[in-house]
C-alpha cells in the first residue's frame, strides 16, 4: 500500500498490545476541517478514510474528501470519487476468465515490447474454487468422494491453468476445490475487519475493504467490511492498481427493532428484507442497518441479510462493527491481537456502533419490526417475490395458470419402472445449498433437528426428490457431526455432496433418468426448493420451472412432503409409524433447542479447518502445470483460449464515431438477468455452443457447464442470450436464444444472426425494458454481447454491475427518458437505429437516437447516456477498461 500526502494533517497513531499503528483519523478530520462528520453513515466513514489515506492530489484531492463531508447537507451527491479496495476476492467461474485476461494482457504487452511482470496484481487477490462441483451423485455415503473425483476430472485443464496463475502472478492465492464457498471462506477466515500493512517501514491500520467477482461478495458487510461485487474486468483493473470509479452513493438506513418470533429463521427475515427493499428501490445505493434490533441479531444472520444485497438491488447491505462483530471474530478463531485491533481502531475512528450513539444521517430510511416476520419462501422465478408459507399452494396454482397448465392440476402421471406417480408441483430437487444459508449455524442446526424429529416419527424423503447438502464451509460438517445431527440428515438423503455452490448456481446435476423422462414426456411443471439466493428462470435446472427459495429446515420439510401444492402451515407433512398425521409444527425445533446446538460450535473447529486452507487434497496437489511468465496457449483446448480483446491494440484509441443504421439483434422485456444473457448452467447439445463443442470432438457427457467454459470465448459468445427461458419480442411465442434476422425475416439463433450481421459489417443494438442485467456480476454477459457485435444497449433502466460491465467492454449504455419505452415507441425490432456520438460525449449527456422504420418513417428521440463518470468515459473511449489499463501500463 502506498499512502497519500495527508495535506489535511489527519495522520494519527494508535497503540494496541504494545504495537503502534499509524492511521488516518476521522476525528482529526472532524476537529480540524469537517464539523459533524461523525453523523455520516458508517459505510461512508469507510469511504472517507479511504480518500484520506490515498489523497495524492491527482486521483484523490481535498475536493473529493470535502465532497463526502458535504454529503451530510444534501444526503446525496453527484461527485465522483476514486475508491481503492484493500483486496480482491474471486471465485473460479469469474476468476478463470479474469486470469485468462491477465494472461492475454501479458502476451499483448510482450508483443508491444514491454515486460510481462508489469501485469501482476498490486493488491492481495484470493481466488476460491467453489463453482465447479456438481451434484452427480446424491443420497449416498460416497457422494462427496464421487463428486470430487468427477469435478477434478472435468476441470483438469482449468485447474492446471489456475495453478499456473498461482505460480506466475504475485499477490495471488488460490483456495483449492473442496474447501468451501468463497463468501464463507471470506467471512470465516480471509476477512479481518481491520487490515494492517507496512509502508516505508511504518505500520498502518485501516478498514478491510474489497471488491469481488461475485455479486454476493456483499456477505462480508455483515462483518463490518465494506465490499461489493464487480465484473471480472473491473476487478482486474482494480488488481492492476486502477481505482474503482464511483459516485458518492445515497445511503438508505434500514432500522431494525424487536426480535424474531419463535420458529422464525434468518431466511424468513432476509426474504422479507429483500421484498421491502426491492419495493423501495435501492439500485446503486448503499443500505445500512441500524437500530435496537441489532442487539439480538447474531452475526451469521447479519451476513445472511448482507449476502442478498444483489437481490434487493443495493450496492451493499452494511452492518457496522459492534460487540457482535468481536464475538464472531473470537468464535471463528481469529488471533487475539487482530481482535483487539479491530475494537480499538473502530472506537478510535467513530466506527464502533452502540445503541446509545446518535443515529447517522441517511438519505432515506425504512423500518422493520423483527417480530412481524412470518415463515416464508420466495418464487417461483424471482427472489424478491416473497410468499407466505400458507400461500404457497395458491401461488403455485397461479403459476400453473400463467404457463397454461391449470387444467392438468389434479392429473397424475406414471413413472416408468416405479411404483409412484407424479403431478405438477412435485418437488424434484430439495437442496441445502448456497452462500446465503449454508454457514449459518442456526438454520443448519434447525435443518438437522427437523431431520432428527422426522426420522424419530418414521418420516422419509419422497422417492422423486433429489436431495443434497453442500455446505459453504468444512466447519459445518464438524458441528453437524459433533451435534449428532448429520446422521439424521444422511438417513433422509441429505448426504454431503460437496463443498461449493452446487444447486444454487445451476450445478444441480441431472435428475434421475426415470424422473427426467416423466417430466419431459408430460411437460410437467415441477418445483425445486432450495436454500439459495436466486431462482431465475432456467437457472437451477433446465427441467424445473418453479423454483422456491426457503430456509434449510423448510428444504428438509418439502423433501418429506414432496409437493408445493400442500399448505404446510395446516396440512400434514406425512404420517408416522402408526399412520397418524404429522404436521410441520410436530417436527419444527424450538429456538431453545436450536440455541443449545449452536452453543456447541467452537473456535477450535474453525482453527482446525483453516489451518491449511491453501494446501488442498491429494487430487489438487497432483496437478502439474508450466511455470513460465507467459501462458503457453493450447489452440486445441476447449476450456482455455487466447481471447481476442487485445489483438491489434494500437497505442492510442480511435476517435468515437456515430453508430449508423444498426439493426436490432433482440428486443427484450423487463428483468432480463445476467443469467438470461449468459447462462452458467448446462449446455444443450443442439445449441450453437453445443454444436461447437461437438465439432471439437467433445462428447455431450463432457460438455460440463457454461460457467466452467468461461475461459473459452468461442463457447461463451455462442452461449450469449442462449438461456432456454429467455423471450425475445422479435420472435413472439418462442422461448430460447432465437431472433429474427431482419434482412430476410428468417428465425435463427441469436449467435447465427449476429455472425451474419458481422459478415456484412452491420452494427447491432439491444433494446429492453426495466432492470436490464439484474443478477450475477457476470462479466461474460457484457463480453459476449461485445463479441456478437453489439455497439449499444438501450433500456428503461440498468442494474448497477451490468451497466458498469457494458462500459468496461466498450458498449454504450443508453436509457430511455422517463415515459418513453419500446412499447410507447411501438418498436418491433425491424427498425434501424442511429446514435449520434463523438469525442465530445460527456457523462450523463442526452444522446440523440434516430429510429428508421421499415415503411421509411423516421422518429428522433433523446436518450440518457448512462456513462456516469469521467473515468467510465475514458474506458468507453478506449474500447474497454482493460484496453485502457494496458495502454496506460505500456506507455
From Swiss-Prot:
<dbReference type="GO" id="GO:0051539">
    <property type="term" value="F:4 iron, 4 sulfur cluster binding"/>
</dbReference>
<dbReference type="GO" id="GO:0006099">
    <property type="term" value="P:tricarboxylic acid cycle"/>
</dbReference>
<dbReference type="Pfam" id="PF00330">
    <property type="entry name" value="Aconitase"/>
</dbReference>
<dbReference type="GO" id="GO:0003729">
    <property type="term" value="F:mRNA binding"/>
</dbReference>
<dbReference type="GO" id="GO:0003730">
    <property type="term" value="F:mRNA 3'-UTR binding"/>
</dbReference>
<keyword id="KW-0004">4Fe-4S</keyword>
<comment type="function">
    <text>Involved in the catabolism of short chain fatty acids (SCFA) via the tricarboxylic acid (TCA)(acetyl degradation route) and probably the 2-methylcitrate cycle I (propionate degradation route). Catalyzes the reversible isomerization of citrate to isocitrate via cis-aconitate. The apo form of AcnA functions as a RNA-binding regulatory protein. Could catalyze the hydration of 2-methyl-cis-aconitate to yield (2R,3S)-2-methylisocitrate.</text>
</comment>
<dbReference type="GO" id="GO:0046872">
    <property type="term" value="F:metal ion binding"/>
</dbReference>
<dbReference type="InterPro" id="IPR001030">
    <property type="entry name" value="Acoase/IPM_deHydtase_lsu_aba"/>
</dbReference>
<keyword id="KW-0408">Iron</keyword>
<protein>
    <recommendedName>
        <fullName>Aconitate hydratase A</fullName>
        <ecNumber>4.2.1.3</ecNumber>
        <ecNumber>4.2.1.99</ecNumber>
    </recommendedName>
</protein>
<feature type="binding site">
    <location>
        <position position="435"/>
    </location>
    <ligand>
        <name>[4Fe-4S] cluster</name>
    </ligand>
</feature>
<comment type="similarity">
    <text>Belongs to the aconitase/IPM isomerase family.</text>
</comment>
<dbReference type="GO" id="GO:0019679">
    <property type="term" value="P:propionate metabolic process, methylcitrate cycle"/>
</dbReference>
<dbReference type="GO" id="GO:0003994">
    <property type="term" value="F:aconitate hydratase activity"/>
</dbReference>
<dbReference type="InterPro" id="IPR044137">
    <property type="entry name" value="AcnA_IRP_Swivel"/>
</dbReference>
<keyword id="KW-0479">Metal-binding</keyword>
<comment type="subunit">
    <text>Monomer.</text>
</comment>
<keyword id="KW-0411">Iron-sulfur</keyword>
<feature type="binding site">
    <location>
        <position position="504"/>
    </location>
    <ligand>
        <name>[4Fe-4S] cluster</name>
    </ligand>
</feature>
<dbReference type="GO" id="GO:0047456">
    <property type="term" value="F:2-methylisocitrate dehydratase activity"/>
</dbReference>
<comment type="pathway">
    <text>Organic acid metabolism; propanoate degradation.</text>
</comment>
<keyword id="KW-0816">Tricarboxylic acid cycle</keyword>
<comment type="pathway">
    <text>Carbohydrate metabolism; tricarboxylic acid cycle; isocitrate from oxaloacetate: step 2/2.</text>
</comment>
<dbReference type="InterPro" id="IPR036008">
    <property type="entry name" value="Aconitase_4Fe-4S_dom"/>
</dbReference>
<feature type="binding site">
    <location>
        <position position="501"/>
    </location>
    <ligand>
        <name>[4Fe-4S] cluster</name>
    </ligand>
</feature>
<dbReference type="InterPro" id="IPR015931">
    <property type="entry name" value="Acnase/IPM_dHydase_lsu_aba_1/3"/>
</dbReference>
<keyword id="KW-0694">RNA-binding</keyword>
<dbReference type="Pfam" id="PF00694">
    <property type="entry name" value="Aconitase_C"/>
</dbReference>
<dbReference type="InterPro" id="IPR018136">
    <property type="entry name" value="Aconitase_4Fe-4S_BS"/>
</dbReference>
<dbReference type="InterPro" id="IPR015928">
    <property type="entry name" value="Aconitase/3IPM_dehydase_swvl"/>
</dbReference>
<dbReference type="InterPro" id="IPR000573">
    <property type="entry name" value="AconitaseA/IPMdHydase_ssu_swvl"/>
</dbReference>
<dbReference type="InterPro" id="IPR006249">
    <property type="entry name" value="Aconitase/IRP2"/>
</dbReference>
<keyword id="KW-0456">Lyase</keyword>
Amino acid at each position: 500500500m502506498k499512502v497519500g500526502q495527508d495535506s489535511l494533517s489527519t495522520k494519527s497513531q494508535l497503540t494496541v498490545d504494545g504495537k503502534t499503528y499509524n492511521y488516518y483519523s476521522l476525528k482529526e478530520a472532524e476537529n480540524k476541517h469537517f464539523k459533524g462528520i461523525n453523523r455520516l453513515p458508517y459505510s461512508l466513514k469507510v469511504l472517507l478514510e479511504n480518500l484520506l489515506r490515498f489523497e495524492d492530489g491527482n486521483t484523490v484531492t481535498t475536493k473529493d474528501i470535502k465532497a463526502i463531508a458535504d454529503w451530510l447537507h444534501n444526503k446525496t451527491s453527484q461527485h465522483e470519487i476514486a475508491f481503492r479496495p484493500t483486496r480482491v476476492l474471486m471465485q473460479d467461474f469469474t476468476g478463470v476468465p479474469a486470469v485468462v485476461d491477465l494472461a492475454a494482457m501479458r502476451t499483448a504487452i510482450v508483443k508491444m515490447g514491454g515486460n510481462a511482470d508489469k501485469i501482476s496484481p498490486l493488491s492481495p487477490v484470493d481466488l476460491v474454487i467453489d463453482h465447479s462441483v456438481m451434484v452427480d451423485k446424491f443420497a449416498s455415503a460416497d457422494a462427496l468422494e464421487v463428486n470430487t473425483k468427477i469435478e477434478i476430472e472435468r476441470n483438469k485443464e482449468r485447474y492446471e491453468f489456475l495453478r499456473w496463475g498461482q505460480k506466475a502472478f504475485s499477490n495471488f492465492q488460490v483456495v483449492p476445490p473442496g474447501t468451501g464457498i468463497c463468501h464463507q471462506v471470506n467471512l470465516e477466515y480471509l476477512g479481518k475487519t481491520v487490515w494492517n500493512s507496512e509502508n516505508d517501514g511504518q505500520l498502518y491500520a485501516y478498514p478491510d475493504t474489497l471488491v469481488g467477482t461475485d455479486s454476493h461478495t456483499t456477505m462480508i458487510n455483515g462483518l463490518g467490511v465494506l465490499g461489493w461485487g464487480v465484473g471480472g474486468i473491473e476487478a482486474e483493473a482494480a488488481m492492476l492498481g486502477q481505482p474503482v470509479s464511483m459516485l458518492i452513493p445515497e445511503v438508505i438506513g434500514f432500522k431494525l427493532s424487536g426480535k424474531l418470533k419463535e420458529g422464525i429463521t434468518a431466511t424468513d427475515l432476509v426474504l422479507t428484507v429483500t421484498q421491502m427493499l426491492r419495493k423501495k428501490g435501492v439500485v446503486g445505493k448503499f443500505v445500512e442497518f441500524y437500530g435496537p434490533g441489532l442487539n439480538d441479531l447474531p452475526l451469521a444472520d447479519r451476513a445472511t441479510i448482507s449476502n442478498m444485497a444483489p437481490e434487493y438491488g443495493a450496492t451493499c447491505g452494511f452492518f457496522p462493527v459492534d460487540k457482535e462483530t468481536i464475538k464472531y471474530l473470537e468464535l471463528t478463531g481469529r488471533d487475539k491481537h487482530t481482535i483487539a485491533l479491530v475494537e480499538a481502531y473502530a472506537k478510535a475512528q467513530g466506527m464502533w456502533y452502540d445503541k446509545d450513539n446518535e443515529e447517522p444521517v441517511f438519505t432515506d430510511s425504512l423500518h422493520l419490526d423483527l417480530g412481524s416476520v412470518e415463515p416464508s419462501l420466495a418464487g417461483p422465478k424471482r427472489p424478491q417475490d416473497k410468499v407466505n408459507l400458507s400461500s404457497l399452494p395458491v401461488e403455485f396454482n397461479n403459476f400453473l395458470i400463467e404457463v397454461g397448465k391449470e387444467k392438468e392440476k389434479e392429473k397424475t402421471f406414471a413413472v416408468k419402472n416405479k411404483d409412484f406417480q407424479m403431478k405438477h408441483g412435485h418437488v424434484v430437487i430439495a437442496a441445502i445449498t448456497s452462500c446465503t444459508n449454508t454457514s449459518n449455524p442456526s438454520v443448519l442446526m434447525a435443518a438437522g433437528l427437523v431431520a432428527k424429529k422426522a426420522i424419530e416419527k418414521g418420516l422419509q424423503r419422497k422417492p422423486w426428490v433429489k436431495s443434497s447438502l453442500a455446505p459453504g464451509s468444512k466447519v459445518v460438517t464438524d458441528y453437524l457431526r459433533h451435534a449428532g445431527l448429520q446422521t439424521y440428515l444422511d438417513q433422509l438423503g441429505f448426504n454431503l455432496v460437496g463443498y461449493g455452490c452446487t444447486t444454487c448456481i445451476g450445478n444441480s446435476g441431472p435428475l434421475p433418468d426415470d424422473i427426467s423422462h416423466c417430466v419431459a414426456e408430460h411437460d410437467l411443471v415441477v418445483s425445486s426448493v432450495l436454500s439459495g439466493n436466486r431462482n431465475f428462470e432456467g437457472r437451477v435446472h433446465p427441467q424445473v420451472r418453479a423454483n422456491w427459495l426457503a430456509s434449510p429446515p423448510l428444504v428438509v420439510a418439502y423433501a418429506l412432503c414432496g409437493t408445493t401444492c400442500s399448505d404446510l402451515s395446516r396440512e400434514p407433512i406425512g404420517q408416522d409409524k402408526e399412520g397418524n398425521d404429522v404436521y410441520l409444527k410436530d417436527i419444527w425445533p424450538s429456538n431453545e433447542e436450536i440455541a443449545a446446538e449452536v452453543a456447541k460450535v467452537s473456535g477450535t473447529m474453525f482453527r482446525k479447518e483453516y489451518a491449511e486452507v491453501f494446501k488442498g487434497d491429494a487430487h489438487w496437489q497432483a496437478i502439474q502445470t508450466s511455470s513460465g511468465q507467459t501462458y503457453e496457449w493450447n489452440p486445441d483446448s476447449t476450456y482455455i483460449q487466447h481471447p481476442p480483446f487485445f489483438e491489434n491494440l494500437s497505442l492510442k484509441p480511435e476517435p468515437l464515431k456515430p453508430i449508423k443504421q444498426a439493426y436490432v439483434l433482440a428486443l427484450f422485456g423487463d428483468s432480463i438477468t445476467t443469467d438470461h444473457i449468459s447462462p452458467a448452467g448446462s449446455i444443450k447439445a443442439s445449441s450453437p455452443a453445443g454444436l461447437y463443442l461437438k465439432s471439437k470432438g467433445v462428447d455431450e457427457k463432457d460438455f460440463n457447464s457454461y460457467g466452467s467454459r468461461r475461459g473459452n470465448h468461442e463457447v461463451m459468445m455462442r452461449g450469449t442470450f442462449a438461456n432456454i427461458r429467455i423471450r425475445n419480442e422479435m420472435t413472439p411465442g418462442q422461448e430460447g436464444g432465437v431472433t429474427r434476422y431482419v434482412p430476410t425475416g428468417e428465425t435463427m439463433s441469436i449467435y447465427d444472426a449476429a455472425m451474419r450481421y458481422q459478415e456484412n459489417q452491420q452494427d447491432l443494438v439491444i433494446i429492453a425494458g426495466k432492470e436490464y442485467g439484474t443478477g450475477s456480476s457476470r462479466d461474460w454477459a457484457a463480453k459476449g454481447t461485445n463479441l456478437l457485435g453489439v455497439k449499444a444497449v438501450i433500456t428503461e433502466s440498468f442494474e448497477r454491475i451490468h451497466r458498469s460491465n457494458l462500459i468496461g467492454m466498450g458498449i454504450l449504455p443508453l436509457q430511455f427518458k422517463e415515459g418513453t419505452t419500446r412499447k410507447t415507441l411501438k418498436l418491433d425490432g425491424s427498425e434501424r437505429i442511429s446514435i449520434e456520438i463523438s469525442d465530445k460525449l460527456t457523462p450523463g449527456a442526452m444522446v440523440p437516437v434516430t429510429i428508421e422504420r421499415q415503411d421509411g418513417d423516421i422518429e428522433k428521440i433523446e436518450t440518457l447516456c448512462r456513462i456516469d463518470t469521467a473515468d467510465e468515459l475514458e474506458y468507453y473511449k478506449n474500447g474497454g477498461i482493460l484496453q485502457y489499463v494496458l495502454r496506460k501500463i505500456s506507455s
